[in-house]
Design a protein with these regions (language model features):
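Transmembrane helical bundles and short interhelical boundary loops of multi-pass, membrane-embedded
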Residues: 15-18, 491-549
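Membrane-interface helix-loop-helix junctions at transmembrane boundaries of multi-pass membrane enzymes
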Residues: 201, 251-261, 299-301, 399, ...
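Transmembrane alpha-helix segments characteristic
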Residues: 14-18, 265-266, 430-452
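Hydrophobic, aromatic-rich transmembrane alpha-helices
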Residues: 381-432
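Short hydrophobic/aromatic helix or loop-helix immediately within or flanking a transmembrane segment
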Residues: 125-173, 276, 380-381, 386
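Transmembrane-helix motifs of polytopic, lipid-linked glycan transferases
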Residues: 163-165, 179-202, 415-419
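Membrane-interface alpha helices of multi-pass inner-membrane proteins
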Residues: 223, 244, 248, 256-284, ...
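Transmembrane-helix signature of polytopic, membrane-embedded enzymes
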Residues: 174-179, 195-217
């Protein structure tokens, strides 16, 4: 089947050249060099996105689960020939345009005294890594120097090396940060066709549609996907690995060529993650090993597969420990010991920073037993970014808009992730139930670990959490389908619990910043929230039991 034709170039080529001219005009340096560099990146991005979208959509073949749906009932997003293309278009456009607008607006409407914002960067890590990438690209040093400890702002070196490579050969005259913004948007969008194809094959069209739209439109991923960060690359490599694994697990004995393709995509995904962050590769391996164990019916595993997993896992441990302990100060004596020491020291530091930077947290820490501090930091981290704070904390307009969008996105996603366990338990097929329970367990373990690692930071915490966003989108998509089919009342009840939390905390923040309403002591407010939650929870149990009688 031909999935890419010369007709595609009739729009790809002129659009790439036109957008390349616009981007080159927005950046300093020789216009012709910038135009050629940007045009090449646009041409590559549009070609690969078109190719992968057509491939994932099967050239217009019906989605699994929609074949028997009458044509007159397939409207809007249920038309199998429309949704994936629109997802990819919106995913790329929103991230790229948002990244360009942020880059141009922050030096004007942000905090101009801030070094990162005055340079057009929303993330400090992105700014520092970008600056070091340009320094390396404009020097006489080899690109692989990105992996030594001289360049400390990229802990693992992979993205720094790639960024320097782009600058050295596509922007040799001047520093053009928008090239990396373009590549981030491209990588984020490239994950969608693989996510779509894998979820459609594994769970059907409805989960594929819901997961795809959540992935395409989630605000935190829009901001990260429009920045020169590692997360968009994580999502793309995770999607490659997901598709390779799903295709491998669901292959038939006579599909030897499919087995080869599956191994290639799986290796590409895991290998890419190892270069960017070994810990993400290790987390993905754990997810897929558990998945394979569940799908194989606890049967025997081939020797080559077991050896490959063990070798890659051990290599990942060594890469991670060496990256974390570049200066040899953590000790531990082994990769696991080094990683354990790093996590312990990192959590201590984050708790200290949270207490130091917030007067009311200092007050709460003074009033609570010491054993409660770590659980408090964990819960506080899970609720970051706090939606009421986004409305009331004093800041610039551009940052208020960004904060509200990020918080609304998380507080929409959070109930779905809470319900993911219930949705998994409600699956009629045993293997499907076990698989979604496994994915829910891993995602929530990751959320808790990142809440500890990021503390109460409203930027690092959500960013760490979003590293496994691809899997969160799958869980949330399954919850949406489960609720639409079952009309389970716990969907509304969990949202009601969240509404109670937002009302109380909204009033607390309103009193703190604009002196609106009475001031409840923090402990009393928590007790009130817990009481309302208990009423909703036990009333829900009573209603369910009454209906079942």
């Amino acid at each position: 089947m031909k999935i890419f034709s010369q007709r595609d170039f009739l729009w790809i080529l002129p659009l790439s050249l036109g957008l390349g001219a616009v981007l080159s005009s927005l950046q300093l340096g020789n216009w012709l060099i910038g135009w050629l560099g940007f045009s090449f990146l646009f041409l590559l991005s549009f070609s690969l996105l078109t190719l992968s979208t057509k491939w994932a959509n099967g050239g217009g073949l019906p989605l699994r689960g929609l074949r028997d749906t009458p044509l007159e009932k397939r409207s809007g997003l249920l038309d199998h020939q429309k949704p994936l293309a629109w997802m990819v278009i919106l995913a790329f456009t929103l991230r790229f345009v948002g990244g360009v607008v942020t880059y141009l607006a922050l030096p004007v409407y942000g905090y101009v005294d801030d070094e990162d914002q005055s340079a057009g960067f929303a993330y400090t890590d992105a700014h520092r890594r970008d600056a070091q990438a340009w320094d390396l690209a404009s020097s006489d040093l080899p690109i692989y120097d990105a992996f030594n400890k001289t360049y400390a702002y990229d802990q693992y070196g992979g993205l720094l090396a790639f960024s320097a490579l782009v600058y050295r050969y596509l922007s040799p005259d001047v520093h053009r940060p928008l090239m990396l913004v373009l590549l981030s948007a491209f990588m984020a969008a490239l994950a969608l066709p693989f996510l779509w194809k894998a979820t459609n094959q594994q769970w059907g069209a409805k989960v594929a549609l819901a997961s795809g739209w959540i992935y395409a439109l989630y605000p935190e991923s829009l901001l990260l996907g429009g920045s020169a960060m590692r997360e968009p690359y994580f999502w793309a490599f995770s999607a490659f690995a997901l598709w390779g694994f799903v295709n491998f697990v669901n292959r038939t004995p006579i599909q030897s060529q499919e087995t080869l393709y599956s191994r290639v995509w799986l290796a590409l995904g895991i290998g890419g993650m190892l270069l960017l962050s070994p810990i993400v590769a290790l987390a993905t391996i754990i997810i897929l090993v558990g998945w394979f164990y569940i799908s194989s019916g606890h049967g025997r595993v081939s020797w080559w597969l077991a050896i490959a997993v063990v070798v890659v896992f051990i290599a990942g441990l060594f890469l991670l420990s060496s990256a974390l302990d570049r200066n040899g100060e953590l000790g531990g004596g082994s990769p696991i010991g080094i990683i354990n020491n790093f996590m312990r020291e990192a959590v201590k530091w984050d708790v200290y920073q949270l207490e130091r930077d917030s007067g009311w947290v200092q007050k709460l820490f003074d009033e609570m037993p010491e054993w409660m501090r770590l659980p408090f930091v964990t819960v506080y981290g899970i609720f970051q970014p706090v939606l009421p704070a986004a409305f009331f904390e004093p800041t610039k307009l551009i940052w208020r808009i960004i904060a509200i969008l990020r918080a609304v996105g998380w507080y929409t996603m959070l109930p779905a992730l809470i319900l993911s366990v219930g949705a998994a338990a409600g699956q009629s097929v045993e293997s499907k139930r076990r698989l979604f329970l496994w994915l829910s367990f891993i995602v929530w373990m990751w959320i808790i670990i990142t809440a500890l690692r990021g503390g109460g930071d409203s930027w690092d915490n959500p960013r760490y959490r979003t590293i496994l966003f691809l899997w969160q989108a799958i869980l949330a998509g399954n919850v949406w389908v489960w609720w639409r089919e079952s009309k389970n009342a716990w969907f509304q009840r969990v949202f009601a619990m969240e509404l109670v939390f937002l009302i109380f905390f909204g009033q607390w923040y309103a009193n703190r910043y604009i002196h609106f309403g009475p001031q409840l002591p923090f402990a009393l407010m928590v007790i009130c929230i817990a009481a309302f939650w208990a009423v909703i929870f036990f009333w829900g149990l009573w209603r369910d039991r009454k209906r079942s009688v």
